[in-house]
């Protein structure tokens, strides 16, 4: 359908001679330069989630149910801030492309503040809805208690470290600093999130709260590293 529409001469963009189209290898390489590290980062994140889930599965059905619901709630309270981060990538990309590096720095700071406000509001709303959700879901009393405690922990810790660990990174990726972001994210996830979770669960007998302690450690380390990187301004030296 798209090909047929493109052949319509009344369209603003009309393509009716496909045999004349040739790949722009230079442009493709620049796209892959950004896309491949991001893809590796996301793949490692999925492997990490699998490793954590395999550890949680050894804690019993009560812990599994509590952690599953908490995961959903944690995803919900981060949606608004993630949207800010995705929008930031477009804004920073345009600023860097136009050579306005000062504006890129300004917008990263400004949208980080907006994301922080979104995180605080979202966390409070989700926390207020936690008990009604566990009741509507028919969760066992012990699972509901674990879920409430983990959601409380997230509500306290997420506004402290989440924004610094993710929002500046969106902007730095848009500026072409993708390798540093990939290495930092993968290293902090495996060294903090996965390792802490497995260690606390299997050595000290922690319950599913170990997952969120590990995640908070991951966010904190990542936030510190990305903050140092942001203030160093080295991420502005890339050419896309």
Model-inferred region functions:
Residues 43-76, 94-95, 132-141, 201-204:
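Helix-terminus/linker motif at the lipid-water interface of multi-pass membrane proteins
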């Amino acid at each position: 359908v798209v090909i047929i529409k493109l052949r319509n001469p009344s369209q603003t963009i009309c393509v009716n001679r496909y045999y004349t189209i040739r790949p722009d290898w230079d442009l493709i390489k620049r796209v892959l330069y950004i896309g491949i590290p991001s893809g590796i980062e996301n793949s490692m994140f999925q492997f990490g989630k699998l490793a954590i889930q395999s550890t949680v599965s050894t804690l019993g059905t009560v812990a599994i149910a509590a952690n599953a619901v908490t995961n959903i709630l944690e995803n919900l309270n981060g949606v608004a801030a993630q949207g800010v981060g995705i929008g930031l990538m477009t804004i920073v990309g345009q600023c860097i492309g136009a050579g306005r590096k000062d504006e890129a720095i300004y917008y990263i700071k400004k949208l980080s503040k907006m994301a922080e406000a979104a995180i605080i509001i979202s966390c409070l709303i989700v926390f207020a809805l936690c008990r009604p959700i566990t009741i509507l879901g028919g969760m066992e009393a012990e699972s509901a208690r674990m879920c409430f405690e983990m959601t409380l922990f997230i509500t306290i810790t997420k506004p402290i470290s989440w924004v610094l660990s993710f929002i500046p990174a969106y902007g730095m990726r848009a500026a072409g600093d993708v390798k540093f972001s990939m290495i930092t994210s993968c290293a902090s996830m495996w060294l903090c999130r996965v390792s802490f979770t497995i260690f606390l669960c299997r050595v000290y007998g922690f319950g599913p709260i170990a997952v969120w302690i590990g995640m908070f450690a991951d966010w904190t380390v990542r936030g510190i590293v990305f903050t140092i990187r942001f203030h160093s301004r080295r991420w502005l030296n890339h050419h896309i």
